[in-house]
């Protein structure tokens, strides 16, 4: 829960006669994800649509501080049956473009710097998702954001862990490029009838063309509580 703890450990002597303790410590982590929305008035953003969790325990990771950097997608490991694909890229280490202040089960939230290259070319109203055709905006090559068609198969309001929509990728170009939904696409905005309705969050391991999404209402509510 982020609180300090004091523990007593009894060391064990190894074969060389040296006393040792076993310690499992994780002090940082990094990865590629997608910004879902940005408010130019407050310079705040929401991303991922789910929390950053420990890869070994699946627990939501507390953090003291976090930073965001620009990245470029260099390669894609395609998703397949039983195996999640991923976007692979390089970070721009010339400087941070923002800071994180919250890691929640509904996404990560932060602010961008004054000189951040992130721009708001259009303001899109928010709306509730409904079953039917939709599009997602994703960056799966270089730094270009493209629009791809998907189908919202089912809406599950209030479902836990960012699984409020069941999605099916229908765009042949995206399926050819990535196999469907891959790691790194989390946070990709879902638009329906020109309105922002949510973000991509998870992929089905049994079928990479299908996955889940969180509603934008749930994500915005989580951001307001941080």
Positions of predicted regions on the chain:
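C-terminal recognition in membrane/secretory proteostasis and scaffolding
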Residues: 1-226
